[in-house]
Amino acid sequence: MVYLLVFQVHAQTLSEYLEVAAENNPQLQASFHQYLAAVEKVPQVGALPDPQVTFGYFTKPMEMPMGKQRAEITLMQMFPWFGLLRNSKDEASQMANARYQGFLETKNQLFYQIKSTWYEMYKLEEEIRLMEENIAILKSFERLAISRFSSGNSGSTGSTTPRDMSSTQGNIQNQQGGGGMEGMGGSSTSSGNTRSSNSMNTMNGNTMSSGGSMVDVLRVQMEIKELENTIKRLEDSRKPLLTRFNKLLNRPVSETVQVVDTLVAGELPLDRLALLDSVMNNNPMVRMYDFERQAFDTQKEMARREGNPMIGVGVNYMIFSPATNGEQMQMGGENMWMPMVSVTIPLNRKKYNAMKKEAELLGNAAQFEQTAARNQLSIQWDETIRDLDDAARQIKKYQEQITLAGQALRLITTTYSAEGAGFEEVLRVQQQLISYQLNLINTIVDQNEIIARIEMLAAININ
């Protein structure tokens, strides 16, 4: 069998996988490019409107005292009200910052998925390793049970051999025949029946003892088959996990993944109040709504300024050709410059009032969404801390139970080796020990997954 996952002492670290995902994950790249696109909007809204150039040509020159006007060129530049461009740039910058917080949220969720999948892969390999170790232990129990069964069949005391069985059966037949020959002779018949009964009891007891030992062998073989089937089922789970992990990194599914051979119980090195403060203030969703609310406040100010006039400054250049009078004398013909100023008149006040109201309502919505996000984070924080404390208690409990179950198993195994009794209890304690070991692995993985969840909520890297 070719294993898709490998264990190495100097394995590729989880942080290196996170770096690969940060560079290659398409969803994260899409979010980052959305942020870059939002940044490019800042210079767009902060620029002046394009200047306007107008050119007019008279097909029939206009007769004027200063000559014949042939053409006219007008250049005009409009200027928004004071501060409007600055507000536009601020609003675009704040929206870009909100986009960046969305990118950080996507990154944190991606990293959490990668860590969770990586921990699941570790748990899977540990479960397979534990099952293989327990199969080896059960095979040693099988050899012990076979040894007890063999010694029970060949021993002279408390056992039944084929020769003994034949002799006993012959005695029974002889006793039954003697009773029939003697007829009413009660003494001989009674003595024969007593010996026959004793022989039957001895044979049945010895046969049950041998049969019980054989049942022990069959029982342990059943347990081995069950564990072998469990291992095959666990091995079938390797490929889906490997595919999920590699696709999060945007790599081919054939790429191998290395996980640590030992995962220790995690802990929080930081003060919980400091972590809670980070969750409530540094979580990207909370900060995103902060920037959105600031952007809508700026939009409200922009709407107020857009209700003011726009000022235009320009120049008009008129081209003349000389005109002739009645005496055929040329007059005028000099081109003329004319400075110009224009002002827009924002008469539709309803439009600008509606723009201000829209920005105000959107700002209120962002505030409510931020409050809802903080409430949800508070719930998640309490549930996460509860799970973390419970995992710590469970780890301590399972470690103690594994120690006690191991001691009990050694005592029961010693008793069975010496006396041949209590094999069912040996298997029961062994199953308990396996259960405790599996629960310990699962709880350690859960604890590390919980810490990864806290890292996602607080937007920090603890380990």
Q: Which residues fall in each region the model found?
A:
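Charged, solvent-exposed faces of alpha-helical coiled-coils
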Residues: 27, 34, 41, 88, ...
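Short segments within alpha-helical structural elements
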Residues: 107, 139, 168-177, 183-184, ...
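Bacterial Sec-pathway N-terminal export signals of envelope proteins
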Residues: 9-61, 74, 78-80, 84-87, ...
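Acidic, glycine-rich loop-and-beta core segments that form the ion-binding/anion-interacting portion
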Residues: 267-268, 272-322, 337
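Periplasmic alpha-helical coiled-coil/stalk elements that build and connect Gram-negative outer-membrane
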Residues: 109-278, 387, 391
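Sec/SRP-type N-terminal targeting helices
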Residues: 29-33, 46, 80-110, 219, ...
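Small/polar, glycine/serine/threonine/aspartate-rich low-complexity segments that form flexible
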Residues: 54-84, 88, 165-205, 260-269, ...
